[in-house]
């Protein structure tokens, strides 16, 4: 889903700026119970073990967590040794499990959160907003609430304050489709880890992505009609489906030969396209979402 690509984009953009990046996806289900004693430290310790084995990592670390991978992210933040090396933590439509006593607010990290649709932002940390450390700004976007503008960056990254950015649009399938979320997320990255690199605007990237996506969608819709056409007229299918075809005398020999040739050509021309639509969509997302070019378009 597109929220996964947004994690890759974050990782590539941070890596482009010289950071060591850990991309946490799904924790191993069944490896350990989740939230035992109100913590997630035991969910995926293998991430921490691997991180500690990399002795050359002494700082400039970014950790991301996608969906349930947010549990892995939490395990990173709760590790007393490694959390001090983390400069930025990114949770994308993530699950949590931290408690006030286990959040390492004293460490050098900042957080950008895109909360899941319909989930109380406070539930990620399991305690009331009033009980949150003053360094953490908990934000909830409520329909009809215009107390702040969509896309506004809250908190001060220079002081390493943590930020929770909650939007009703940040759902799993569509987290990284909308242009305003593109811009906002890269705004977070830019302020979390500033770079001296000059980024040239390229406004054609996003419209091109949409155009190609709509073309693929149209081709996918056409698949049903073409399949029905094949069942109705292709000789190989019509006999098994008991479809009545025009007799040879009803149409000319040339027209019949052309129709049979067309019936045979259609599957060879179109079906490989349909069969690879999913992989093509992945390729499109990789090209238009998982490169720094999309960042140059919206930073």
Spans of features found by a protein language model:
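Membrane-helix interface motif
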Residues: 231-237, 272-288
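Alpha-helical transmembrane segments
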Residues: 259-272
